[in-house]
Amino acid sequence: MLKGSTGSIRSVAIVGAGLMGRRIAGVMARAGLPLVLTDSQPVVLDSALAEARAMAPGERILGEVDLASAVVDADLVIEAIVEDLDAKRGLFAAARAAAPEALLASNSSVIPISRITEGLAGADRTVGMHWWNPPDLIPIVEVIRGEHTSTESMDAAFAVLEFAGKVPVRVQRDVPGFVGNRLQHALWREAIDLVASGVCDAETVDRVVRNTIGLRLAAMGPIENADYVGLDLTLAIHDQVLPSINSDRHSSPLLRQKVAAGQLGAKSGQGFLPWSDGSRDAAAARLAAHIAEQIKNQ
């Protein structure tokens, strides 16, 4: 039973039953929202339904292979498919045809919602809705205003996310990567460059981050920290260090070399670090336990 206010959202369809889609489904269903989960692959859908239903016992989660049937009665459609612009644009067009009045949301982590909805009817009823992995644990959801997104659509997205127990934040300009991923990949760019330029090895980069800035970021964000230490000191440090920090507008040659060589990280057994059998699962469990502990202690 719905308790509280979901704004104009009374039913939800989630398109894409992969890791993100199935867990988003569990979160929304756990809040009591009637929900349909759809995926074109029946085997994937069956697995996802079992996982989502385990997250929300007793709640109504339906499965549907046909996209139009899944979204036709939904007030909110959340797209959680592969990170491919053409695929997302095609899905949005099909969803809009089947659900002309629905609020369409993309879980893209980097693609601007305005690019996905270019030329789409009812673009005022679209938002970016970037959930972080794992979506059932990370509180923040970035709600991105596209070029044509209405204030009503932003408010509706906010209301339903708050109802589901999430912490939505407003991203008022539709830039690639939004807020979190722009910050994250600025750090990754410099981390990879430190390795590529021989300043230190990969293990040292991770050890330094985990035992310095990583310890305090959950308690004090970068803007508050700049204020905390003093903006005069921040300016002096920037004047010294920024000229030597990597500012490339293209991906690292070392990163490209590793991908070309099939060194893809945990999935291939070798990336910047070696990965043995079971080490990825162990890392995932360690990460989930750490996030859960951080949230419990907030």
Sequence positions of predicted segments:
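NAD(P)+-binding Rossmann beta1-loop-alpha1 motif at the extreme N-terminus of oxidoreductases
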Residues: 1-55, 98
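NAD(P)-dependent Rossmann-like dehydrogenase/reductase catalytic/cofactor-binding core
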Residues: 2-3, 31, 163-166, 197, ...
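Internal alpha-helical scaffold of NAD(P)-dependent oxidoreductase catalytic cores
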Residues: 31, 141-174, 185-217
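Structural/interface elements that position substrates and couple domains in central-metabolism enzymes
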Residues: 36, 180, 184-188
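Rossmann-like NAD(P)-binding element
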Residues: 40-44, 56-103, 110-111
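Rossmann-fold dinucleotide-binding core
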Residues: 103-181
